[in-house]
Amino acid sequence: MVSRMGWGGRRRRLGRWGDLGPGSVPLLPMPLPPPPPPSCRGPGGGRISIFSLSPAPHTRSSPSSFSPPTAGPPCSVLQGTGASQSCHSALPIPATPPTQAQPAMTPASASPSWGSHSTPPLAPATPTPSQQCPQDSPGLRVGPLIPEQDYERLEDCDPEGSQDSPIHGEEQQPLLHVPEGLRGSWHHIQNLDSFFTKIYSYHQRNGFACILLEDVFQLGQFIFIVTFTTFLLRCVDYNVLFANQPSNHTRPGPFHSKVTLSDAILPSAQCAERIRSSPLLVLLLVLAAGFWLVQLLRSVCNLFSYWDIQVFYREALHIPPEELSSVPWAEVQSRLLALQRSGGLCVQPRPLTELDIHHRILRYTNYQVALANKGLLPARCPLPWGGSAAFLSRGLALNVDLLLFRGPFSLFRGGWELPHAYKRSDQRGALAARWGRTVLLLAALNLALSPLVLAWQVLHVFYSHVELLRREPGALGARGWSRLARLQLRHFNELPHELRARLARAYRPAAAFLRTAAPPAPLRTLLARQLVFFAGALFAALLVLTVYDEDVLAVEHVLTAMTALGVTATVARSFIPEEQCQGRAPQLLLQTALAHMHYLPEEPGPGGRDRAYRQMAQLLQYRAVSLLEELLSPLLTPLFLLFWFRPRALEIIDFFHHFTVDVAGVGDICSFALMDVKRHGHPQWLSAGQTEASLSQRAEDGKTELSLMRFSLAHPLWRPPGHSSKFLGHLWGRVQQDAAAWGATSARGPSTPGVLSNCTSPLPEAFLANLFVHPLLPPRDLSPTAPCPAAATASLLASISRIAQDPSSVSPGGTGGQKLAQLPELASAEMSLHVIYLHQLHQQQQQQEPWGEAAASILSRPCSSPSQPPSPDEEKPSWSSDGSSPASSPRQQWGTQKARNLFPGGFQVTTDTQKEPDRASCTD
């Protein structure tokens, strides 16, 4: 039944993106009459994979470790790198456990068990002592990628000895087992990334019916734009429409001078003749028809896949289409995990976790977030008056996606594995040159297609926004989150709906901050008031005349003048400060926005407010600016490809070389997506003493720490790895310590009881809204002896954490469903307080740096000891193999002072003056 999404019974076919890789998922086929059993090749002819059977690290399974094949249920045998064929044999369970790890098989009719079930793993292997990492969680296994590279990959970690990693250079074939009742519909899934992505997209797009209608309407909208534009160009007699010449009235009746629409429309034969007389128009129509057919085929294929996803939701997850809108994504994810734990869905030999699902859905998105964190995205253009302007239009983002991930000549080529050539440091120059030629080719293609794309952009904007502009002229003056904001403010492993919800909560305080913190411009305000007065007076006069006699509208350009005057008055009114925002403190508004944005575009110092305003204005920009960027995108995209991305080809290749890790069962992912504080933590974000990251390996702006904290709060059942778990424990211990210090000191004001007592509503959002009335951010004139304002936040954080851990205290008297529905709101409120608390500690440490490194280290850990020599990671070159000394990082070139020591033309070599300030050892 199902042969879509790369699924297809016993047919030998390649996956959607090519050969089967670590994401391929063979399903147990339907029982068939057993043909003559083919010879199942041993170690020399391909790895035998049964129920995701994988050999021990750096070893191969020998035929002697298996029992002789006997007649029984069919089993799936995978050979080579992905070609699959059926081998009808069975491996019985040994009667006596051997001394070595032996694979245990169950009959095909029974669902295999994993994790905590009684059935042992099929191919357990204990790693060598050099590969064991007792501090890491057994749920996260990361394999070595390139042993000779500068950036240390996360090694194979298998502390319990119950799992094994695939052989280096050999793909792992995880198995998807479906219960007996579903085997008629689910045969073979070859692309788990597409499978999980479509499961998420099906939920977010509200089911199959909405997806079908959305695709139909999009195809119909394309046809309408093309046909209606052609009709306006070739089928309308504008001389008759504008009454420049009399029309030929053929209808019977009295002659009248008014022109009707039918008089201006040409006959169909004449219209077709005028269309055929323009070869350019015919060529454009043919191209449009070809593009529409491609979109139609793509939509049909996707609809077949989504129909299968609907069957999976209904039969496997027990979520019918009519209940989909009332089921949150967290519930869908929990049912997926429960299905895998029960044996109904085995996509890998170890238990599936929330992080595995996010890694597959957000494989490429995490790379983009890391590129933005390292200053390679978005593209920036220097301004003549100083500073720079970021540019990331939809067209440029599509080109970047084609260059890096999904294009035919991209790095990933739409798959889950980075080619091995990019993992070798000796080919970086050749790969960078080849990628630079690809960028040049794509830029030339963009330049050739720019007239067509520009015409399409103009038509789409015209049809979409002109009516809105006439009805609501101030709509273009409204602000919205830019594409830059959605990239820079995004956490690692954050799904799109989570980002949208967070930015929606931050919109109102951020917009109010921009209105309040705008630099004073009395002359501009005075001119705007006068312009509003004169434009409004003229508009009022024309409006009164129109009401008195509607024939005034027949006067030439009267309606045009009224529209222009209304737009002018609305635009001028936007430059007048609102009176209700005059008395509000910008610091409180910025703090409220920070609680939901999680990243603060701010620099300490006397000019911090102006810089914060400019950077916030780039994140929350006017709609008119966004439309202008999209209109200019066809012309600017080739220039940015040539002058921004092509000169940075070597840096981008090095980025993927150093920040790609191979996770067993998942494939190649960005190392930042693991949220490993030890590898990518920053000492100024409470990870001092716990991170070994050099300057080039650190994630800027506390992205690793904040992403880890958000993910752990959003998924309470997820077990983080050892170093990340240690950081979370250290953070909570610091919160408890500061909360106890605040409660024990009676000299401080009772802000915590006041906030809690003033909040009359038990709902978390009401508590959080009441909390932001009190200033929590540290003052600008902080001194080393000033009282720590983070202690007040820690006290509040400890209080709300106790509420979150005790669901009975949420909405007392409410039903169980209401209490469960409020738990995500409590997690959001707790995350907001954690963000404020970490930013307070970070600002204190930044402002105390002039008084010495010792004072800065005290804020991040309770004790310190004499400094020790820098680690080898700091002495070796960061990312660079040529030993060159670059000038500065891309983030530093464009005015952002937080990021330092990166890579514009080679990569930064850590010198003595650039070593970490906090390298002292500390025992808790």
UniProtKB/Swiss-Prot annotation:
Residues 78-88 have a biased composition (Polar residues). GO terms for cellular component: autophagosome; endoplasmic reticulum membrane; Golgi membrane; phagophore assembly site; phagophore assembly site membrane; recycling endosome membrane; trans-Golgi network. Residues 28-40 have a biased composition (Pro residues). InterPro entries: Autophagy-rel_prot_9. One of its GO terms (molecular function) is phospholipid scramblase activity. The chain crosses the membrane at residues 208-228, 277-297, 527-547, 552-572. Residues 913-924 have a biased composition (Basic and acidic residues). Residues 229-276, 548-551 are lumenal. Induction: By hypoxia, leading to inhibit NOS3 expression. It is found in: Preautophagosomal structure membrane. One of its GO terms (biological process) is bone morphogenesis. Pfam families: ATG9. Highly expressed in placenta (trophoblast cells) and pituitary gland. Not expressed in vascular endothelial. Residues 1-144, 847-924 are annotated as: Disordered. It catalyses: a 1,2-diacyl-sn-glycero-3-phosphocholine(in) = a 1,2-diacyl-sn-glycero-3-phosphocholine(out); a 1,2-diacyl-sn-glycero-3-phospho-L-serine(in) = a 1,2-diacyl-sn-glycero-3-phospho-L-serine(out); a 1,2-diacyl-sn-glycero-3-phosphoethanolamine(in) = a 1,2-diacyl-sn-glycero-3-phosphoethanolamine(out). Residues 439-459, 625-645 dip into the membrane without crossing it. Residues 1-207, 298-438, 460-526, 573-624, 646-924 are cytoplasmic. Coiled coil: none annotated. Residues 17-27, 98-113, 878-890 have a biased composition (Low complexity). It is a multi-pass membrane protein. Homotrimer; forms a homotrimer with a central pore that forms a path between the two membrane leaflets. ATG9B gene is located on the opposite DNA strand of the NOS3 gene at chromosome 7q36. The genes are oriented in a tail-to-tail configuration and the mRNAs encoding ATG9B and NOS3 are complementary for 662 nucleotides. ATG9B transcription may a role in NOS3 transcription regulation. Phospholipid scramblase involved in autophagy by mediating autophagosomal membrane expansion. Cycles between the preautophagosomal structure/phagophore assembly site (PAS) and the cytoplasmic vesicle pool and supplies membrane for the growing autophagosome. Lipid scramblase activity plays a key role in preautophagosomal structure/phagophore assembly by distributing the phospholipids that arrive through ATG2 (ATG2A or ATG2B) from the cytoplasmic to the luminal leaflet of the bilayer, thereby driving autophagosomal membrane expansion. Forms a homotrimer with a solvated central pore, which is connected laterally to the cytosol through the cavity within each protomer. Acts as a lipid scramblase that uses its central pore to function: the central pore opens laterally to accommodate lipid headgroups, thereby enabling lipid flipping and redistribution of lipids added to the outer leaflet of ATG9B-containing vesicles, thereby enabling growth into autophagosomes. This is Autophagy-related protein 9B. It comes from Homo sapiens. The lineage of its organism: Eukaryota, Metazoa, Chordata, Craniata, Vertebrata. The gene is ATG9B.
